[in-house]
Each structure stands twice: as structure tokens, then as C-alpha cells.
């Protein structure tokens, strides 16, 4: 009984620790993942640049809201032109909603005219848990010094209705504009909204 309790406590502690690594205004957790072209990509590759992390699941209605309206792509294009690195991360486990292979990921990028710097695969969910990523979309901004400056929702209206996009405050747009202008972000941590990430059980 005691061993069972201690084992459960250890598992709970590990889970809590994994989901508590992310802290605003602290160094962003480093990671290395494979992209949809089979290349190895590390966060450290982009030291000196602003980086956006976007957790995504193409079947999620909340993700569809921002892609079918071209809202996400507009952000990718706007800030890509300003040398911001955009990393779209798929943490759906094999066999679960949102999981795709490399060919499917590249097809989705082409079909949606998306402009991420890379689409990255996190099938065991370890990077998602490092960042306490809970939903799709869940957005993060990292500054050129590698410090996490924003984590949360893409905007202020928690709905899957594209009609709400023009009425919402886009936290990613506001945050990146501030950082690129040498200013600080006012809202550094906001509640994410969307579909739960389909992590490996």
C-alpha cells in the first residue's frame, strides 16, 4: 500500500513538474524536434531572434477559426517579414485527433497557404508539457535573449466563430508589435482557449 501510494505520488509530482517548467520572464525551456521536412530543429538555433510557438491541431474548430479566416496566416506573413521565427508544434499523439505525418503536414501548410518557419512534431508530448501547453491554439512569444515574454490565448474572445476575430484583441499581434518596438508586453499571461491537446496517454 505504501509503495503504491509513493509510486502514485512520484508520478503526480513528475506530472506537476513537467507542467510547471514554463515561467514568464524566465529563460524559455530549450528543445529539439524534427520538422515536416525531416530536419532537426532546436530552439537554440534561433538565439537572437523573436520566436513564436503555436500549438496546433488542424481538426480543432478553434484552430480552423483562425486558419479558415486567414487570421493565423496573416500573423505569420506579417511577422515573418520582420524576421520573427514561427514554429507550429503538433503534440497530438499517434492515433489521436490532430496527429499527422510529414506528408500530411506539408499538404496542410500548402493547402492553407500557411507561412510557419517550421512545422514541428512532438508526438510524445514532452515539449508541450515543458511549456504547460494545454490547448490548440496555445501561443508563446520568446524574445531574442531566449526569455519567455508571453503565454496564452491568441486573442481575447474565447469562441470558434470567425466573426469574433475583428472584435477581439489579438494578444500575439499586440505582444510582438510591442517587443519589436522595444517596449514591454502589458498582458504577459492570458488564459488559453481551444481544444485540449491530445497528448499521449
Regions found by a protein language model. Give the residues of each.
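Sec-dependent signal peptide recognition
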Residues: 2-11
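Conserved segment of the thioredoxin-like fold in thiol-based oxidoreductases
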Residues: 80-121
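A short beta-strand-turn-helix
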Residues: 31-51
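Short, internal strand/loop/helix patches
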Residues: 106-143
Amino acid at each position: 500500500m505504501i509503495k503504491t501510494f509513493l509510486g502514485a505520488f512520484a508520478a503526480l509530482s513528475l506530472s506537476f513538474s513537467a507542467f510547471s517548467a514554463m515561467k514568464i520572464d524566465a529563460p524559455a525551456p530549450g528543445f529539439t524536434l524534427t520538422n515536416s521536412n525531416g530536419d532537426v530543429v532546436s530552439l537554440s538555433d534561433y538565439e537572437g531572434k523573436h520566436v513564436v510557438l503555436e500549438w496546433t491541431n488542424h481538426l480543432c474548430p478553434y484552430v480552423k477559426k483562425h486558419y479558415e479566416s486567414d487570421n493565423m496566416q496573416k500573423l505569420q506573413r506579417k511577422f515573418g517579414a520582420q524576421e520573427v521565427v514561427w514554429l507550429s508544434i503538433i503534440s497530438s499523439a499517434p492515433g489521436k485527433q490532430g496527429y499527422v505525418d510529414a506528408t500530411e503536414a506539408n499538404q496542410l501548410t500548402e493547402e492553407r497557404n500557411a507561412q510557419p518557419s517550421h512545422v514541428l512534431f512532438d508526438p510524445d508530448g514532452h515539449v508541450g508539457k515543458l511549456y504547460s501547453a494545454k490547448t490548440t491554439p496555445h501561443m508563446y512569444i520568446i524574445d531574442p535573449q531566449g526569455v519567455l515574454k508571453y503565454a496564452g490565448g491568441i486573442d481575447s474572445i474565447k469562441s470558434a466563430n470567425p466573426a469574433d476575430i475583428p472584435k477581439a484583441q489579438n494578444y500575439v499581434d499586440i505582444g510582438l508589435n510591442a517587443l519589436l518596438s522595444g517596449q514591454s508586453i502589458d498582458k504577459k499571461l492570458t488564459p488559453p482557449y481551444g481544444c485540449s491537446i491530445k497528448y499521449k496517454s
